[in-house]
């Protein structure tokens, strides 16, 4: 997938960025380079290869420091939301910023 200068213009418009022609060209080159790397990675046949828990485990025996995923602090949602200007059903209400 290669982007065109028109794609960069559209992305910049959606992100509300003003890019100079030089910045636009540099962005086009960088993004197309990134997509090129992604295409190379997608072309690699990984069927039959077991996933790694850590990439270093391939080259040496590593004791991973994994722990049980447990909450270590009490739920303080209500206390944290007391200073919010608007809350509804436990969620912060914010003004719409995207048209």
Swiss-Prot record:
Subunit structure: Heterotrimer of A, B and C subunits.
GO biological process terms on file: glutaminyl-tRNAGln biosynthesis via transamidation; regulation of translational fidelity; translation
Classification via NCBIfam families: gatC
Task performed by this protein: Allows the formation of correctly charged Asn-tRNA(Asn) or Gln-tRNA(Gln) through the transamidation of misacylated Asp-tRNA(Asn) or Glu-tRNA(Gln) in organisms which lack either or both of asparaginyl-tRNA or glutaminyl-tRNA synthetases. The reaction takes place in the presence of glutamine and ATP through an activated phospho-Asp-tRNA(Asn) or phospho-Glu-tRNA(Gln).
EC code: 6.3.5.-
InterPro entries cross-referenced by the UniProt entry: Asp/Glu-ADT_sf_sub_c (IPR036113), GatC (IPR003837)
Annotated gene: gatC
Alphabetized UniProt keyword annotations: ATP-binding, Ligase, Nucleotide-binding, Protein biosynthesis
Keyword Ligase: yes
UniProt-recorded Gene Ontology molecular function terms: asparaginyl-tRNA synthase (glutamine-hydrolyzing) activity; ATP binding; glutaminyl-tRNA synthase (glutamine-hydrolyzing) activity
SUPFAM superfamilies in alphabetical order: Glu-tRNAGln amidotransferase C subunit (SSF141000)
Family per similarity comment: Belongs to the GatC family.
Pfam families the record matches: GatC
Protein name: Aspartyl/glutamyl-tRNA(Asn/Gln) amidotransferase subunit C
Catalysed transformations (reactions): L-glutamyl-tRNA(Gln) + L-glutamine + ATP + H2O = L-glutaminyl-tRNA(Gln) + L-glutamate + ADP + phosphate + H(+); L-aspartyl-tRNA(Asn) + L-glutamine + ATP + H2O = L-asparaginyl-tRNA(Asn) + L-glutamate + ADP + phosphate + 2 H(+)
Entry annotated with the keyword Nucleus: no
């Amino acid at each position: 997938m290669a982007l065109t200068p028109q794609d960069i213009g559209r992305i910049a418009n959606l992100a509300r960025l003003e890019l100079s022609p030089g910045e636009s060209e540099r962005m086009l080159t960088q993004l197309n380079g990134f997509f090129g790397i992604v295409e190379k990675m997608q072309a690699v046949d990984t069927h039959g290869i077991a996933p790694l828990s850590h990439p270093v485990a391939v080259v040496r025996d590593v004791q991973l420091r994994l722990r049980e995923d447990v909450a270590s602090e009490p739920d303080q949602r209500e206390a944290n939301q007391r200073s919010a200007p608007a809350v509804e059903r436990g969620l912060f209400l914010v003004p719409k910023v995207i048209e």
